[in-house]
Regions:
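C-terminal catalytic ATP-binding subdomain
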Residues: 41, 66, 92-94
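Rossmann-like dinucleotide/flavin-binding elements
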Residues: 1-12, 49-61, 70-84, 92-160, ...
Length: 234
């Protein structure tokens, strides 16, 4: 196949460098994946258009027989009072903050540097208890933060392979990371997160920093826009 790859940022890899920085190398080293895929793109003579967002007009100008959409999902902030407060951070804002440091230091060195300095409060409440939230909890606990994870469902760790999750949950318990399931987050304040527990009790989870690490939602906008214009859209 003759392949053209659009990437709106200035480098390949998407959020993999961020994932590599958060995960570290102890359990799952993501860095070789980034290196391997980037190398293969070069070896296979794939036309890479960095710094270009894949718009409908640009795609159709290529006159493609098929389009594979791999733009990733959307990380949205919930409709929650106080979510725009200064003590709140989400995946998108965190990605912007670490973009330059990742370019300068790389994932491994930045992972080590965050153990020396991390501009996040001592007490952290994480909204979202699936793969993003639990990996964030591990990262922060290893850096001395007191972590509480708030999850609306009763299930934690969706997206994490079972063999890892079976080891992760005991580790979190041993490190005093609080996992609160079946809760409703009512409001974010300067003092933390006001929640309603599954037994209908209203309480404040005290936190200096609130991190919204909810799972991403599908982004089907480009898929819908291309329907009928290209023979195959995947």
């Amino acid at each position: 196949h003759d392949v053209t790859l659009f990437e709106k940022s200035s480098r390949l890899g998407g959020k993999l460098p961020l994932a590599a920085m958060i995960k570290g190398v102890e359990v799952e080293d993501v860095r070789p994946v980034i290196s391997y895929l980037t190398t293969q793109v070069g070896k296979l003579n794939i036309k890479v258009r960095l710094g270009e967002e894949a718009t409908v007009s640009k795609i159709l100008a290529e006159k493609p027989d098929a389009v594979v959409i791999a733009t990733g999902g959307l990380y949205r902030l919930p409709s929650l009072k106080g979510v725009e407060n200064r003590n709140v951070a989400g995946v998108n804002s965190l990605s912007k903050q670490v973009k330059l440091p990742l370019l300068v230091f790389g994932p491994e060195l930045l992972n080590k540097l965050t153990k020396l300095f991390l501009p996040i409060g001592k007490r952290v409440a994480i909204i979202g208890g699936q793969i993003e939230g639990l990996q964030g909890a591990v990262f922060l606990r290893k850096r001395g933060r007191e972590v509480t994870v708030l999850e609306p469902s009763e299930t934690f760790g969706k997206g994490i392979p079972p063999r890892y999750l079976d080891r992760l949950k005991p580790w979190l318990a041993k490190k005093d990371v609080q996992l609160l399931g079946g809760v409703t987050c009512d409001q974010i304040t300067d003092q933390g997160v006001v929640i309603t527990t599954k037994d209908k009790q209203r309480k404040l989870i005290e936190a200096d920093t609130v991190m919204v690490l909810l799972s991403q939602e599908p982004d089907t906008s480009l898929l819908e826009a291309l329907k009928g214009s290209v023979k195959e859209v995947l």
